[in-house]
Regions:
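C-terminal "post-core" interaction segments
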Residues: 1-207
C-alpha cells in the first residue's frame, strides 16, 4: 500500500534563498530532505549524486544474532523513487574519484528504481532560468578556480591508477613509483598555491 505523509499546518520558517550541499555519501533522510527542497523548487542542490538509499529496514532478533529486513520504500512527492538513482544535484561539483563505485546502484542485489503516482503539491516561485544561469557561471568558475582544477588533476591521476593492469612488486620499481607519486603531488599542490598567491612548498616532506 502507498501512504502519503505530510504536514498541512506546517509554516515556512526560512524565506531567504537556500542551497543544500550533498555528496555520494548523503543517504536516506538527507536524500528525503534534498529531494523535497528540489521538488518544491525551494532551493538548489549542489554537489554530487547521492547514495540512492530509498528503502527502510527493521532488525529482527534471532537466537544467534539479528536479521535486517527491508520492509518499505520511500518516494519523492513527484512519485519518483530515490532507490538506486539518488538525488541528482542542480549544480554538480567535481569529485576526486568515481562516485559510481559506491552507492546502492553498485550493489548486485539492490532493489531497482521505480515510481508511483505523484501527490498534489504547490511549488515555490523560483525562476527556472536561475539554475541554468548558475550552471553557466559554475562552468566558468570550474575553469578558473585553482581549487577546482586541483580536484580535477587528482581525478585524472585516479583514473590512470584505476586503469593500471600491472602492479610491480619489485622493491626498486616501487621506490621509483613512490618518488614519482610524491613529485606529482608536490607539483599540483604548488601549482594550486601559486595560483592563489600562497607560499609554495620546497619539498614533499614540507607539505
Amino acid at each position: 500500500s502507498v501512504r502519503p505523509w505530510g504536514d498541512p499546518r506546517a509554516k515556512q520558517v526560512w524565506k531567504k534563498p537556500m542551497a543544500v550541499m550533498v555528496d555520494r555519501y548523503s543517504a536516506s533522510a538527507s536524500e528525503i530532505f534534498a529531494g523535497a527542497i528540489q521538488d518544491y523548487q525551494r532551493g538548489i542542490i549542489i554537489g554530487q549524486k547521492t547514495f540512492g538509499k530509498g528503502t527502510v529496514q527493521r532488525l529482527d532478533n534471532l537466537t544467534t544474532g539479528q536479521i535486517k529486513i527491508t520492509e518499505s520504500k520511500f518516494y519523492r512527492i513527484t512519485g519518483s523513487g530515490m532507490q538506486s538513482k539518488g538525488i541528482h544535484p542542480d549544480i554538480t561539483l567535481p569529485s576526486t574519484w568515481d562516485i559510481e563505485e559506491i552507492g546502492e546502484s553498485s550493489y548486485d542485489t539492490a532493489l531497482q528504481w521505480d515510481e508511483i503516482r505523484p501527490v498534489r503539491f504547490k511549488k515555490f516561485s523560483m525562476e527556472s532560468s536561475l539554475i541554468a544561469q548558475l550552471n553557466d557561471e559554475h562552468l566558468v568558475r570550474v575553469n578558473q578556480s585553482p581549487n577546482l582544477q586541483y580536484i580535477l588533476d587528482i581525478r585524472k591521476r585516479y583514473e590512470i591508477q584505476k586503469n593500471k593492469k600491472v602492479i610491480s612488486l619489485n622493491l626498486t620499481n616501487r621506490r621509483i613509483e613512490k618518488d614519482e607519486r610524491q613529485s606529482w603531488a608536490l607539483d599540483i599542490e604548488n601549482k594550486r598555491r601559486s595560483s592563489l598567491n600562497l607560499q609554495i612548498f620546497s619539498s614533499y616532506k614540507a607539505m
